[in-house]
Amino acid sequence: MSLHLVDADGHLHSEKRLKEYLTTIVAPSVSQSGSAATADDGDGDSTLEAIGVNYHVVGVFGGQSSGKSTLLNHLFGTDFQTLNEAVRRGQTTKGAFMARANDALAGVEASSAAVVADRLASGAADRSSCLNRAAAAAATKDVADGAHGASRTASLMLVLDFEGTDGLERGEDQCFERQLSLFGLSIADTLIINMWAVDVGRFNAANLNLLRTIFEVNLQLFSHDKYEAEEKPTLLIVLRDFTEDDPAPSLATVRKSFDTIWEGITRPAQFAGASIDALFHLKYYVMPHYKLQKTEFMTSVETLQRWFSDSQCPDYLFSHRAMFRGVPLEGLPAYLTSCWEAIRTSKDLDIPTQREMLAQHRCKEAKMQELKAFRHFARNYEDRLLHGEMLLRLSEVLDEEMETRLTSFYRQTKLYNSDVVGQYANELETELVNATMRVLNRLSKAIAAEVLSNAEPRVLNSVEESLRQLLKSAQTLPFSAGEGPGAAEAAEVNDVEGDAAHLVGAQRMDSPACQKLVRSFWRSLSRHVNEVVAEVAAMPPRAHLYGRYVALIAQDPTTRLNVLNIVTDALFQKVKSRMVSMADSACDTMHAGFERSLTHNSDGTARFFATTKGLQKAVPAATQAGVVVLGSLFYFRLKLVAAADDDGIGADAAGTALPQSRSARRVRQDRHRILFNDNDAEAAFYLSYSTFDTAPKYPYDVPVRSADCDGEEAGAAADCILLSQQATVRAYELYRQKCDFTTQLQLRTIEAGKQRLPAWVIPALFILGWNELLYVLTSPALLVLVVVICAVFFKQFFVSQWHAFEETGPASVVIPTKTVIHTLSTLVRPLLDYGPGPRTERTERSHDAAAAVEEMSHVEATCTHVDPTLGSANLPAAPATMRHRTSRKLD
C-alpha cells in the first residue's frame, strides 16, 4: 500500500495523516479498529517510538518513463503504478509516493537492533544525554530490552518514488523538479539515479541536468555551519539495460560527466577545492536488459537487494553515519511537514535547524506529558495534606516519582538532538522540583507554624535581653576625660533646677566606645537568634519545638531542612519587624532606657536617691544610655545570607550526610543564615556622638544603595535604614525634653521630701545637753540603752543620712568608708549566724527577691515596643513612677 505523499500541485499530506499511514504500515494490527484511532490513542505512538531510528529511506530520481517505478517494485516489492505502454507513453508518477519495502522478498533479511546499535555506536554520544541518573536508567533499560528483542526486530525500509524529469507535462518549468530534489535529499539515506546505459556520454538524453540540480541543492544544504560532513547521502547510479561485457568504460564516462558538472557549479569558498566525493557517497550498479535478459535482470535485482538489506555485504549502503538524519520514526511526520513547508515557501532549508525544531517539538510534548502525570500524582498527596493527614517520608515518595518521570522523558527523547534534550530535561527537572516543593511547602508551613509559636517568644525576649545588656554597658561607660568631675563639682554652687540641664549638656560622650556598644548589641542579638535557629535544626528534633511533628521530622530530612528555612526566614522578619516598631517610637524606647538606667544600678538592683546631687550625678549616665539606644535603632544591621553547604546545620549527631535528592538540593540552595556583618560602607554608617547639647551626627556622607541595585555595590542598604536624618534629630529632641521633664520632677520631689533640721539645732543640743551627754558616756548601761534605742527608732534616719553622705561626699572618703563597712560586715556576719541572724538574713533575702520581682515587672511595664502578635503594652507616665518610688523611700 502506497501513499501519495506529495500530489501534482505540491500539497503534502497533513501530519496527522502521515502518522496514521506510518502506524498502518508498521503495525497493521494496531490500526484494524480504524485509522483515526491509531492517530489519536497512544498505541500508534508507542509503536512508532519502538522503531526509533531503526529504519531507512530510499528514493529514486530519473527521467520520465525511464522505469523507475518498475525498478522499485521488483527491488522492494512495492506496488507503485507503472506505465502501460499499450495505452500511451507519458507521465505516470505525479509528485511523490511513499511505500514500505516488502520484508518477505528473497534476499531481504532481518536486521536486529543489536546490529543497528553497533552501527550507531560512533554517534551514540550525540543522540543520547547522560546528564543525570534518569538518562542512565533509561539507557540501561533500553539496552536490556534490545537484548531480549534482537532476534525479532526487523529494520523498516521506506521507499519514495519521485516524479520523473524532462516530461512534457512540466515543460521547461524546473521549479517543482528542484523542490522535489531538495525534498528527497533532506529525507533520504540513499538516492537511486536511474539512467539508461545507451544515454551515457550524453547531457540531455542522460538527463544530467537533474544531476546538476541535485549537486546544487546538496551544496546548498552543506553550506550551513551546523551541517556535519559525515551525513552526506549516498547516490546509487543504476545503469539500466546494460548489454556490454565490461562496465568500466561506461562507469568512467559517468564519473567524468559528474566531474564536469561539478566543475561548472559555482561553489562556496569552503568547497572551492573539494571534489564531488565531499558531498556524496557515490556507488554504481549495472543491470541487464529488462525484457531481453529477464532472468539475468531478476538475478541482478536479488544481488542489489543485498546492498540494502545484508549488513555483511561488502557493498552495504547503510554502513555510514547518515542513517536518515538521526530523526526517529515518530518524529518523521513533523519533520517532513517542516521541511516541505520551508521548501515551498522558498526559505533556506537548514536540515540541522529542522532537526532541532523537530527535537524541540518532541521534547516539548514529552515534557508536558511527564509534567502532567507528575502533577496529577502530587495533587493526590496535596489533597491528603489538606484533609490533615500526616504523611511520613513524603519527600522520598515525591523524589522517587520525579526520578520515574525523568527516566520516562529520557527514554522517549534519547534519539533526538542531545543539546535540545538536555535543555528540555533541565526545564522538566526544574518544573518537577517546583511542583515537589509546592507540596513540601504545604506540609513544611504547617510544621513551621508550630515551631514558630514555640520559638518566637524566645527570639523576642532575645531582643529585650540584648537591649538590657546595651543599657547596662552604656550606663557604666565613662565620659571623655576632663569633663565629668569638674562639671559635677560646679553644680554644687548653682540653683538646683537650672543646674541639671547644664550638668547634662556639659558631658562629652566617647563616640568610638558608643559605636562599639552598638556593634556589640547587634552581635549579641545575632548570637541569641542563631542559638534558637540551631536548636530548631538540632537532631534529634526537640519535642518542645516540634510538638506532634517530632516523629515526622525525624524520618524526613528534606522536610526538616525546608522547615528550618521557613523558620529562619520568619524569625529574621520577626526580629526586623520588632526593631522597626521600636524605631517608629524611638523617643519612647530611648526614654524607657533612660528611666531604667536612672532607677536601676548596673547590677540590676533598684536605686533610690536621697539628695539632688546624687540624682544629678546619675542623670548623665542614664541620658547616655538612651542616646546609645538611638544609635542601635536607626539602622538594621542583621543580614539574611546564603548558608554554606558544609556548615553542618541539619546533620544529626552521628554525622549522617544530608540527603542528595533533587528536592533536597533545592532546599539546600534556599538555606540562609542570620548574621551581623557590616560591609565597608556600613562600618562607617554609625551615629557620631559629642555632647548632649547637640544631636548625634548623622552619617550622611556614606553612600546608600537602593534595594534594586546589585548586592555587590558598596553602600548602606536603603531598606535597612529605619530612621532618616530628620527622624533621628526629632527623636533626640523629644527624648531630651522628656528626660529634662522627668529629671525636674524627680528633683522637685526630692526637695519637697527633705526633712532637714535648722543648722543651729545640732550645736545648741551639744551646748545645752553637755552634762547629760557626759553622764550617758560615763554610764555603760545607759550608753548601751541609748545605742539600742537609736538603732531601733532612728535606723531609717541614720540610713538616709548615710545615703546622703554617699551621694554628696567626696569619693576619697566615701570609697574607703564603704570598704571598711563591707569588711566589718563580712567578719561579723558569721558570728551572728548562731543567733537570731538567720531570721534577719532570710528577711533580707525575701526583700531582695521582692525587689527583683519588682524590677522585672518594671522592665515589662516600661517597654512600649511589644510586637503586635504579642499584644500591646502602655508605658506608665514618668512622673507617677518617680513619685511612687520617692514616696515609698520616704515612708
Swiss-Prot record:
Domain GB1/RHD3-type G: 52-321
Lineage: superkingdom: Eukaryota
Cellular component terms per the entry's GO annotation: cytoplasm; endoplasmic reticulum; endoplasmic reticulum membrane; mitochondrion
Positions bound to GTP: G62, G63, Q64, S65, S66, G67, K68, S69
Pfam families to which the protein is assigned, alphabetical: RHD3_GTPase, Sey1_3HB
Transmembrane segments: 757-777, 781-801
Cytoplasm as UniProt keyword: no
Keyword terms of this UniProt record: Endoplasmic reticulum, GTP-binding, Hydrolase, Membrane, Nucleotide-binding, Transmembrane, Transmembrane helix
Residue intervals on the Lumenal side: 778-780
GO biological process: endoplasmic reticulum membrane fusion
HAMAP family: Sey1 (MF_03109)
Family under the similarity heading: Belongs to the TRAFAC class dynamin-like GTPase superfamily. GB1/RHD3 GTPase family. RHD3 subfamily.
Protein name: Protein SEY1 homolog
Organism: Leishmania major
